[in-house]
């Protein structure tokens, strides 16, 4: 029977010298220095302790134990002769009188060294995630995640929010990404969906008479992975407030997040309230992005008028935007390398020139802009050693956003990296012209309250104003160039909702059919309400200073939405499929070709109804929006 530990492996100090103790943990390393003399490192969740073997009996036991086996060590604490000030337990060691094997590691070789697991191939790390997580450098991100979630929960409750859980099995609804569908055994041919967000439920809670709601909500979206987005499952701090406007939501977030970022973040400085507010249009004009990184002091200037009649064809009659970068001492090679990286990201060509130390324009396209040197100097504030990077054409705005972030991070003196800088992006357009349809569509969230309410929509319906000029009471929360969340003042009035959809060629019946619960609830008197849902995973990624969101998730999927550790997704038995009334995709006809599942009850396919839903979705929502 295992003897209970008296201390953890990170607990013992010089004051414990002479004490009789029992430690348990993983045998991290063994260094044999003589016939009956060896140093062991014992590791548990809390830290490491050095064990010094000095007897033949104990040495024989140690020789039969592989690294990463779990053991119990009972012995006496003594002061180290050679201390290690880098370790909390570096002043002591334990001399064992007894070592007991608790759980044997059956392999002589590990897939990777535990303390170097972050350098291993990612597929190996995910396959052996339980080994990867033994690495303190990996484990600390999960601990950080736990601490941040606990702090968020405590802060929200201090603001009188109630934590209410909402259903995981629900109806499929158009929210921007593909649903994860769950077949209903008792209802052949019908499906539940895992919620992309608790959007409708939290609005229904407001209609039910609850005043302030929150939860750490699991969300499920069948979308592709990227650095700041994990496929499949993610979590958000979902919140909603009744009888609230935009400023009420802002006040809560501005009070909750900065202290948590300052306490748990890699940097200890965070924006204080109020956060800067930037109109969507101004963000694009000034920063080339609706996700500006305000730690960077660079902005872009529109200089199109200077090149309306230019002989340089790429600039002639085009939108031309410039980003001046003062005190730039990059070489030509360095400039062109960074510019090429930006071109790849934005998918369009960039240009540059520089005012040298003598005040002359040189390099890049300098010879094509010499004719307007004085105007450029005045408009861009050029001084010696100022680099100017330029974007032109239809993708100029997109490229300037990339130029600002790339050069801002690589030219010394233009980015205060060690801080968290928040801002709100406000006044989003309600509508836009769809790239594929060429017709009016909702720009983001169709259930945001339009600026000006019903009166503005009526004018647009009558043709008195351009629908593209209507703004939505929607807002994004951005930190260090990363979108943490979207939120909105909700459209709680059924009549205004119908008018909003009418402009995109959808009628009252469409709204009632696709969103019956919410529409009907609003007809019984809904309060004005507003909310937001910052992404927990993205917040923790920022706080940890990680580039990949997978580093802060205990058991993440890979980029291809596969759980390598558990083997998901996996095939299931024909019996399971039959119980769910699903035709097997592996079924083949007599010629050996794959049989197409028919559009009938019990088939696992997208029927006409589901197809209509996707078409409906595409009319009003961009993929992957977090609301």
Predicted segment positions?
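Class II aminoacyl-tRNA synthetase catalytic cores and aaRS-like
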Residues: 1-590, 602
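Generic short N-terminal amphipathic or hydrophobic helices
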Residues: 625-626
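Ala/Thr-enriched low-complexity intrinsically disordered regions
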Residues: 591, 596-597
């Amino acid at each position: 029977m295992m003897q209970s530990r008296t201390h953890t492996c990170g607990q013992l100090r010089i004051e414990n010298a002479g004490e009789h103790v029992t430690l348990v943990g993983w045998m991290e390393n063994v260094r044999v220095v003589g016939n009956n003399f060896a140093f062991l490192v014992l590791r548990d969740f809390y830290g490491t302790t050095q064990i010094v073997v000095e007897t033949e009996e104990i040495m024989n036991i140690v020789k039969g134990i592989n690294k990463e086996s779990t053991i119990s060590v009972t012995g006496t604490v003594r002061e180290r002769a050679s201390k290690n000030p880098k370790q909390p337990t570096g002043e002591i060691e334990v001399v064992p009188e007894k070592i007991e094997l608790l759980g044997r590691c059956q392999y002589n070789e590990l897939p990777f060294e535990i303390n170097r697991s972050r350098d291993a191939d990612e597929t190996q790390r995910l396959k052996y995630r339980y080994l990867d997580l033994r690495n303190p450098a990996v484990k600390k991100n999960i601990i950080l995640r736990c601490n941040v979630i606990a702090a968020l929960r405590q802060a929200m409750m201090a603001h009188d929010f109630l934590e209410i859980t909402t259903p995981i099995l629900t109806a499929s609804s158009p929210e921007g990404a593909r649903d994860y569908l769950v077949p209903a055994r008792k209802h052949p041919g019908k499906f539940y969906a895992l919620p992309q967000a608790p959007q409708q439920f939290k609005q229904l809670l407001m209609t039910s008479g609850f005043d302030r709601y929150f939860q750490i909500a699991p969300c499920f979206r069948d979308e592709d992975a990227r650095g700041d987005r994990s496929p499949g499952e993610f979590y958000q701090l979902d919140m909603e407030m009744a009888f609230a406007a935009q400023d009420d939501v802002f006040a809560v977030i501005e009070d909750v997040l900065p202290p948590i970022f300052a306490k748990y973040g890699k940097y200890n400085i965070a924006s204080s309230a109020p956060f800067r507010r930037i109109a969507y249009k101004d963000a694009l004009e000034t920063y080339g992005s609706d996700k500006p990184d305000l730690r960077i002091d660079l902005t872009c200037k529109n200089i199109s008028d200077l090149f309306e009649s230019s002989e340089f064809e790429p600039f002639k009659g085009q939108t031309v935007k410039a980003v001046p970068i003062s005190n730039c001492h990059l070489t030509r090679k360095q400039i062109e390398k960074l510019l090429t990286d930006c071109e790849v990201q934005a998918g369009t060509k960039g240009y540059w020139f520089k005012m040298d130390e003598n005040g002359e324009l040189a390099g890049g396209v300098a010879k094509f802009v010499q004719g307007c040197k004085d105007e450029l100097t005045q408009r861009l504030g050029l001084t010696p050693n100022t680099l100017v990077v330029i974007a032109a054409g239809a993708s100029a705005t997109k490229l300037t956003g990339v130029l600002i972030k790339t050069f801002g991070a690589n030219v010394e003196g233009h980015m205060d990296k060690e801080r968290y800088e928040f801002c709100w992006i406000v006044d989003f357009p309600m509508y836009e012209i769809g790239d594929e349809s060429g017709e009016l569509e909702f720009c983001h969230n169709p259930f945001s309250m339009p600026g000006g309410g019903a009166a503005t929509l009526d004018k647009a319906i009558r043709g008195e104003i351009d629908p593209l000029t209507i703004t939505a009471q929607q807002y994004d929360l951005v930190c260090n160039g990363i979108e943490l969340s979207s939120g909105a003042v909700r459209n709680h009035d059924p009549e205004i909702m119908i008018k909003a959809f009418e402009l995109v060629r959808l009628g009252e019946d469409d709204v009632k059919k696709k969103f019956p619960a919410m529409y009907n609830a609003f007809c019984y008197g809904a309060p004005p309400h507003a909310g937001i849902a910052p992404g927990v995973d993205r917040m923790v990624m920022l706080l940890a200073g990680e580039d990949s969101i997978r580093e802060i998730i205990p058991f993440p999927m890979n980029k291809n939405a596969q759980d390598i550790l558990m083997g998901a997704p996996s095939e299931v038995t024909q019996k399971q499929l039959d119980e769910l009334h699903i035709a097997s995709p592996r079924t083949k006809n007599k010629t050996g070709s794959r049989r197409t599942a028919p559009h009938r009850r019990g088939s696992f396919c997208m029927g006409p109804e589901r197809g209509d839903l996707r078409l409906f979705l595409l009319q009003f929502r961009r993929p992957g929006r977090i609301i």
